């Protein structure tokens, strides 16, 4: 059990009472066994979890001192600063969530100044929310983020909770959204403009970055060569 986040991650508990069960005050990091031993109540159904999970659990927090009577449970888990390269990124994680009003959770994207750019997920007791007011147990969630910002943070937040339920996440991955093979101008199409870009790479006009080098290797033999140009030309002529 650990109430400290991994390196470069931040927990913000500044907007909740300094009471309750200490190990469950705000986002905590626990083994599945430790968490389930507190009380099962469907916690054990998070079978996607592997090792230590990140948990917000106002149900267990409230068991000491009737903590929710002092104010609502509000906690934010903030990712390290994510540098962007102008390409979309994919955020994926395993999630295990039980709903009870007035508890709400969200996943938001903010810029380096903390301003919200996009809300990727919102669960609440409202039938119009992403969970349709119900539980969302043992799911793999995935989101694409496209923004002009150079740097962003991700924020997993629980707020307005009393003696309610919980949210656990695990296996967070943040990856570049690599364009399809051959889409050298990243416009979603394979056409003559991509062929011209490939020719420019081969004659040295363009020095490809890692992503561009991947999508220009048409035959996926580990290098970009004139055989890729011929193969791509044949494809363009037949489509």
Task: Please name every model-derived segment.
Residues 1, 77-79, 84, 88-99, ...:
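Extracellular beta-strand-rich recognition modules
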Residues 1-64:
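Extracellular glycan-recognition surfaces and repeat-rich motifs
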Residues 64-84, 138-141:
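Short beta-strands within extracellular/lumenal beta-sheet-rich domains
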Residues 70-73, 159-176:
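Extracellular carbohydrate recognition
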Residues 116-148:
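Extracellular carbohydrate recognition and processing domains
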């Amino acid at each position: 059990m650990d109430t400290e986040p991994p390196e470069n991650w931040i927990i913000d508990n500044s907007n909740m009472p300094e009471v309750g069960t200490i190990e469950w005050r705000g986002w905590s990091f626990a083994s599945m066994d430790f968490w389930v031993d507190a009380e099962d109540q469907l916690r054990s159904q998070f079978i996607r979890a592997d090792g230590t999970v990140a948990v917000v659990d106002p149900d267990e927090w409230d068991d000491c001192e009737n903590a929710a009577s002092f104010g609502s449970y509000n906690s934010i888990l903030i990712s390290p600063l994510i540098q962007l390269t102008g390409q979309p990124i994919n955020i994926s994680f395993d999630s295990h969530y039980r709903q009870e009003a007035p508890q709400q959770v969200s996943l938001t994207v903010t810029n380096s100044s903390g301003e919200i750019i996009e809300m990727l997920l919102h669960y609440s007791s409202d039938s119009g929310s992403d969970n349709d007011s119900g539980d969302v147990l043992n799911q793999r969630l995935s989101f694409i983020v496209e923004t002009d910002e150079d740097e962003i943070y991700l924020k997993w937040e629980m707020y307005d909770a009393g003696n309610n339920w919980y949210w656990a996440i695990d296996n967070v991955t943040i990856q570049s959204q690599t364009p399809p093979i051959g889409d050298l101008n990243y416009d979603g199409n394979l056409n003559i403009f991509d062929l011209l870009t490939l020719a420019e790479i081969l004659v040295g006009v363009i020095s490809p970055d890692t992503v561009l080098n991947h999508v220009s290797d048409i035959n996926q033999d580990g290098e970009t060569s004139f055989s890729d140009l011929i193969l791509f030309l044949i494809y363009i002529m037949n489509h």
